Amino acid sequence: MSTIIAAPGRVSLDDLARVYAGATLELDPSYWPDVEAAAAIVAKAAQGAEPVYGINTGFGKLASKRIPPDQTAQLQRNLILSHCCGVGPVTPEAVVRLMMALKIISLGRGASGVRREIIEQLQAMLARGVCPFVPQQGSVGASGDLAPLAHMTAVMIGEGQAFVDGRLVPGREALAHAGLAPVTLGPKEGLALINGTQFSTAYALAGLLRAHDLLKAALVTGALSVDAAMASTAPFRPEIQALRGHPGQIAAGRVLTELLDGSAIRLSHLEGDERVQDPYCLRCQPQVAGAALDLLTQTARTLVTEANAVTDNPLVLVVTGEIISGGNFHAEPVAFAADQIALALSELGAISERRIATLVDPALNFGLPPFLTPQPGLNSGFMIAEVTAAALFAENKQRALPCSIDSTPTSANQEDHVSMAAHAARRLHDMADNLAHIIGIELLVAAQGIELRVPHGTSAALSAVIGALRVHVPALENDRYMADDLAKAAAIVAGGVLADAARDALGRDPFPKLG
């Protein structure tokens, strides 16, 4: 397991992707002086006569309540326990680990006022496999992700529950298993740990990474569909894309051209084809996939900025010694980014579903049998697989409606406008699951269509993709139990097998990165 040495403010998307894939993260030691200086400022304020929010006061609507110095530790402990109000399914371990890493990065900026040992506790938990049990539901994305982060923090103090080696155990037991002891929270430390956008941001980043992988898969299956339908590659020419100028469109057109290069199917109908133009789902792939790519690139910038941000409250300004209340905990940028990712996921599924429908329809598929079965009538072929794709697309279309506009006041109207970033980000994973199935169905249908075009074959890159599919799913000759085929195809798509096969066949990586 690799370890990333994080310089808060300069952590990259590649770094975050590595954490999501299982790497650990530690703070660059050069950041400890600012961390310790901010903690000293908080410790001094806790002993002073002036009220400072979250240090010697209550929280939220109770901010006017003064807390004496001898009760500040109890104040922080009570805050954590009272805010462990999450409900619903457990958050996936990869997302929780990413959330923990994001909190380390944020605290490491030296503007939160926590002691070094608090960050070191999080680092050790991450490195030693202590994964807090964090329910998915309960955050409205302002004031930060209070409930989810409280469940994380509870384990740090020996409360709550955590997974260790796949077992759910009490927090204190999880720490002991990892050779750790509970920490006692000092002034402001509980507030700094739970007041932030790290839960929403972790979920949104995970959704972004999955969306990018699915975009690459959709370019591959889109290219397969072009050959299966004996469609034209002329709309993918670089001159067409350059005249519009969008970077994503240019990149998508280039990928489609590379994937289809050398196709004998394409050469077989360069002349004498009576069709003047192909349907939009085939012809406009650079425009649609390219727009999705540009949107994902934009959201990547937003989420990487947020990953490096300090999003708790109040904040400690080490240079001036001030402790200032602000609103960095409001996750509106994350909510907007998640809503945009949802649009990309929905549209990639929408156009894929239309390509599936084109290929199974004998009126549109240019000579292929109905539903791509050699014996239509006796066999139904991919008839209901297409219906499943339509059902999944309809679900994603509904889920793509924006969450960020659905604010509701909380905390006795003190927190009267919230972002709903957590819900916006969480729903991306259901959408990604649906999209993987849609693209998987297109993979099955397009591969079948190409194989029915014998004696003509597709390009070397796409032949390699079909070969990777056929290791797991044979061609459909007669009707069989289809659910297993669909599940295997979705797993192939989600696992990045299509992009890997194409990349290996081409000897280079044709797929665009984010940014």
UniProtKB/Swiss-Prot annotation:
Contains an active site 4-methylidene-imidazol-5-one (MIO), which is formed autocatalytically by cyclization and dehydration of residues Ala-Ser-Gly. PROSITE patterns: PAL_HISTIDASE. It is found in: Cytoplasm. The modification 2,3-didehydroalanine (Ser) is found at S143. GO terms for biological process: L-histidine catabolic process to glutamate and formamide; L-histidine catabolic process to glutamate and formate. It comes from the Bacteria. The keyword Hydrolase does not apply. Gene3D superfamilies: Fumarase/aspartase (Central domain), Fumarase/aspartase (N-terminal domain). It holds the Pfam family Lyase_aromatic. Its EC number is 4.3.1.3. It catalyses: L-histidine = trans-urocanate + NH4(+). There is a cross-link at A142-G144 (5-imidazolinone (Ala-Gly)). GO terms for molecular function: histidine ammonia-lyase activity. GO terms for cellular component: cytoplasm. Pathway: Amino-acid degradation; L-histidine degradation into L-glutamate; N-formimidoyl-L-glutamate from L-histidine: step 1/3. Belongs to the PAL/histidase family. HAMAP family: His_ammonia_lyase (MF_00229). This is Histidine ammonia-lyase. It comes from Bradyrhizobium sp. (strain BTAi1 / ATCC BAA-1182).
